[in-house]
């Protein structure tokens, strides 16, 4: 379809056609807009084994999507609800959009944070509110985030969420233009640090410190306590409902027993 070539296995024809159309009209990438007019090959792997084979087994077992910007290829593990697959597709397309726009690699935390923001993966941020490490004041730096993104599933989930918070902070600093000023400077800047200096007049180290403070203020112990409070409030409401139900049931049983006892007494009197 158009510039998009979709590769799928039997039984996937409908979703392949639908996703090919999504790719062909993909737009709205923060600070970039539409995907550059390059050919794209979308491969939908029907099984984990096939996905691992297509990605040459180089990705972690929790991976369900991969983008190869130099080749213009996106590979998805096409298993599960279509809405979840659509989010994964948007995430991988964001990788293509960013790399094609900048022309080179940028720090991993920015690449993954950008893709998470572009795909509107806000549920990742909700999980941070229950992160006990952040709640008790443990601070990760951006290198820690990069390592987490390459780690096990649990570490990677935290890494994706923290990367998204870093990109969202840069987005807020851009005002109504969002990430556009930074992304306008990135292609010409020699380094990511140079782009930050040109856009926000700060070094990457300065940004890291401000980002750490921002995370602490948003996901510190107060946020954790509030999130846990809602959880326990819900549990408490369920327990209260169960207790009230049991009391009503016991009262009904006692009433029935009392009535039976009264009838027995009447029969005896007769």
Model-derived regions, located:
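Acidic/His/Gly-enriched intrinsically disordered linker/tail segments
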Residues: 57-88, 96, 100-232
């Amino acid at each position: 379809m158009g510039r998009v070539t979709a590769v799928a296995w039997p039984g996937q024809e409908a979703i392949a056609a639908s996703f090919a159309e999504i790719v062909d009209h993909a737009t709205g990438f923060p600070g970039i807009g539409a995907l550059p007019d390059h050919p794209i090959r979308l491969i939908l792997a029907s099984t984990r084994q096939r996905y691992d084979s297509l990605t040459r087994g180089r990705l972690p077992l929790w991976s369900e999507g991969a983008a190869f910007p130099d080749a213009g290829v996106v590979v998805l593990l096409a298993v599960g609800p279509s809405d979840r697959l659509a989010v994964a597709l948007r995430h991988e397309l964001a990788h293509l959009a960013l790399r094609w726009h900048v022309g080179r690699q940028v720090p991993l935390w920015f690449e993954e944070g950008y893709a998470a923001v572009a795909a509107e993966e806000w549920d990742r941020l909700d999980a941070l509110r229950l992160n006990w490490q952040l709640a008790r004041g443990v601070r990760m730096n951006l290198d820690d985030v990069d390592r987490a993104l390459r780690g096990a599933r649990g570490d990677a989930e935290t890494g994706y969420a923290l990367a998204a918070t870093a990109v969202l902070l840069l987005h807020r600093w851009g005002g109504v233009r969002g990430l556009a000023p930074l992304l306008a400077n990135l292609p010409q800047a020699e380094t990511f640090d140079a782009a930050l200096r040109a856009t926000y007049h700060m070094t990457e180290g300065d940004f890291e410190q401000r980002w750490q403070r921002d995370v602490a203020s948003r996901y510190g112990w107060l946020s954790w306590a509030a999130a846990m409070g809602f959880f326990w409030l819900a549990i408490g409401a369920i327990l209260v409902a169960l207790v009230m139900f049991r009391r009503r049931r016991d009262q009904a049983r006692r009433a029935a027993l009392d009535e039976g006892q009264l009838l027995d007494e009447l029969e005896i009197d007769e």
